[in-house]
């Protein structure tokens, strides 16, 4: 399992605007699995990145760091 950071907009019908970008963290086996997990949400996914090493450690220090686990 790995931790993925997902950048998204709240509404699929809206044009992507950087200032409206939100993030969530999802634990999964692959980017594809994370996309399948999120497909029923009305998210306009911009980008998904796998977090590892120092980058993951940095993100874990954020008060907004909460991981959703795929079941």
Curated annotation (Swiss-Prot):
List the record's Gene Ontology CC terms alphabetically: DNA-directed RNA polymerase complex
Any GO BP annotation: DNA-templated transcription
The top EC class, named as a word, is transferase
Q: Enumerate the Pfam families for this protein.
A: RpoY (PF07288)
Entry keyword annotation includes Transferase:
yes
Q: Which UniProt keywords apply?
A: DNA-directed RNA polymerase, Nucleotidyltransferase, Transcription, Transferase
The record lists the catalysed reaction(s) as:
RNA(n) + a ribonucleoside 5'-triphosphate = RNA(n+1) + diphosphate
Q: What is its EC number?
A: 2.7.7.6
One GO MF term attached to the UniProt entry: DNA binding
Cited function: A non-essential component of RNA polymerase (RNAP).
Give the family, as the similarity comment puts it. Belongs to the RNA polymerase subunit epsilon family.
Q: NCBIfam families from the xrefs?
A: PRK13667.1
Describe its assembly: RNAP is composed of a core of 2 alpha, a beta and a beta' subunit. The core is associated with a delta subunit, and at least one of epsilon or omega. When a sigma factor is associated with the core the holoenzyme is formed, which can initiate transcription.
Q: What is this protein called?
A: DNA-directed RNA polymerase subunit epsilon
Species: Staphylococcus carnosus (strain TM300)
């Amino acid at each position: 399992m790995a931790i993925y950071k997902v950048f998204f907009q709240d509404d699929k019908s809206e044009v992507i605007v950087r200032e409206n970008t939100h993030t969530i963290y999802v634990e999964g086996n692959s980017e594809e699995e994370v996309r399948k997990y999120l497909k029923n949400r009305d998210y306009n996914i911009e980008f998904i990145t796998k977090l590892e090493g120092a980058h993951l450690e940095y993100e874990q220090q954020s008060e907004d760091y909460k991981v959703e686990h795929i079941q």
